[in-house]
């Protein structure tokens, strides 16, 4: 989200009507776990005796607080339901306090996955963005860059209307991803048609130190102050917009999140910086990720 222009009241109300049970939907924490008979499991398998597994449809974690897919020998300590982050969004001229809470995680495990369901959902809170609200709370959805269905270059994403808000020109994708500094220069030719399409297995992204995502704020969540402002077009989110999206990088070693907000009409490279804030409550004292 950024300070720019007004999001239409009509759009917000229409989305709210279509999602009248949104609170119930997005407060449930779940992950998709493959069944024991699924023959498409990757060749590496988690050792269940060595780690606790976060069960589908529950809000419980094991004593070691390791959030693990049954099909992967990997802990996802900093990408799991219930985790909260705190930090800031800043630019040359602005600074805002930001809070993020992860509600659901549903990562793609298979190379042939074609689901368009968001891989991550949660709430995004930004404070003192507008002169009429102390804070603005939105629901965001996100997709992981898995180098197959969702590569770095969004022009190669599925041509689906639901994904249009994540789209950007090749040059914009390249200039933003390069700011993270974790890629070799050989991967960044703007003239190559297959920019960003690496020869990775779909689940390989989980075994890397850095997980890359795109986050998109979809609509406002119910809030007493925000609801009252919807009655007045002249004041509703005056000076603010969440029409753009974020390029995001999660460091699996430290849990830190770095991101950049993008919209063609906004100041470029507004930086998002977050760190986990409730690790004690979830017993996540350190990451299980190891650098090979």
From Swiss-Prot:
One family name in Pfam for this protein: Vac_ImportDeg
GO-annotated cellular components: GID complex; vacuole
GO BP of this protein: negative regulation of gluconeogenesis; proteasome-mediated ubiquitin-dependent protein catabolic process; protein catabolic process; protein catabolic process in the vacuole; protein targeting to vacuole; response to osmotic stress; response to starvation
InterPro entries named in the record: Vacuolar_import/degrad_Vid24
Top-level taxonomic group: Eukaryota
PANTHER family referenced in this protein's UniProt entry, alphabetically: GID COMPLEX SUBUNIT 4 HOMOLOG, VACUOLAR IMPORT AND DEGRADATION PROTEIN 24
Protein's job: Substrate-recognition component of the GID E3 ligase complex recruiting N termini and catalyzing ubiquitination of proteins targeted for degradation. GID E3 is regulated through assembly with interchangeable N-degron-binding substrate receptors induced by distinct environmental perturbations. Required for the adaptation to osmotic or heat stress. Required for the regulation of protein levels of the adapter protein ART2, a component of the ART-Rsp5 ubiquitin ligase pathway, part of the plasma membrane quality control.
Subunit structure: Substrate-recognition component of the GID/CTLH ubiquitin ligase complex. In the absence of stress, the complex exists as an inactive anticipatory complex (GID(Ant)), composed of VID30/GID1, the E3 ubiquitin-ligase RMD5/GID2, VID28/GID5, GID8, and the RING-like subunit FYV10/GID9, awaiting a substrate receptor to form the active E3 ligase complex. When cells are shifted to glucose-containing medium, the substrate receptor VID24/GID4 is induced and becomes part of the complex, named GID(SR4).
Family listed: Belongs to the GID4/VID24 family.
Protein name: GID complex substrate-recognition subunit 10
Organism: Saccharomyces cerevisiae (strain ATCC 204508 / S288c) (Baker's yeast)
